[in-house]
Amino acid sequence: MAKKVVAVIKLALQAGKANPAPPVGPALGQHGVNIMAFCKEYNARTQDKAGYVIPVEISVFEDRSFTFITKTPPASVLITKAAGIQKGSGESAKGSVGSINRSQLEEIAKTKLPDLNCTSVESAMRVIEGTARNMGVAISD
């Protein structure tokens, strides 16, 4: 019989830099999970993606064991890196703070495709394009 899941914890952590300090410690500690074991495993899995924020979904079982799935970085993080800006515009309707070209947009869409509710790269590109527009990042051809 399969183990019963008692909790699902969602966190967004810097790749390769998980440590027992908040937010990791309190989130896992209240469910009795071995925090250091999670940190070591997460850091090992994400060390090649340094500099990105990697969302993680942790399933905690009733015997206090756990499994976790890492997701792709948020679209906003990928867009800001591609555009070379610190953050998106607070007033995206008034003007753009940066721009990315179609090839960069396609690269981001291919990266995000497994986590998006899309089947083709073209539809994923439209989703990412909308995110970029809302951030005040222009798309150039």
From Swiss-Prot:
Key words, A-Z: Methylation, Ribonucleoprotein, Ribosomal protein, RNA-binding, rRNA-binding
Gene3D superfamilies tied to this protein: Ribosomal protein L11, C-terminal domain, Ribosomal protein L11/L12, N-terminal domain
PROSITE patterns with a match to the protein in the record: RIBOSOMAL_L11 (PS00359)
UniProt xrefs under SUPFAM superfamilies: Ribosomal L11/L12e N-terminal domain, Ribosomal protein L11, C-terminal domain
GO annotation, biological process: translation
Keyword Aminoacyl-tRNA synthetase among UniProt keywords: no
GO cellular component terms, semicolon-separated: cytosolic large ribosomal subunit
Alphabetical list of Pfam families matching this protein: Ribosomal_L11 (PF00298), Ribosomal_L11_N (PF03946)
Protein modification: One or more lysine residues are methylated.
Any one Gene Ontology molecular-function term assigned to this protein's record: structural constituent of ribosome
CDD domains: Ribosomal_L11
Function: Forms part of the ribosomal stalk which helps the ribosome interact with GTP-bound translation factors.
Self-association state and partner proteins as the record states: Part of the ribosomal stalk of the 50S ribosomal subunit. Interacts with L10 and the large rRNA to form the base of the stalk. L10 forms an elongated spine to which L12 dimers bind in a sequential fashion forming a multimeric L10(L12)X complex.
UniProt family annotation: Belongs to the universal ribosomal protein uL11 family.
Listed NCBIfam families: L11_bact
HAMAP family, alphabetized: Ribosomal_uL11 (MF_00736)
Identification of the protein by name: Large ribosomal subunit protein uL11
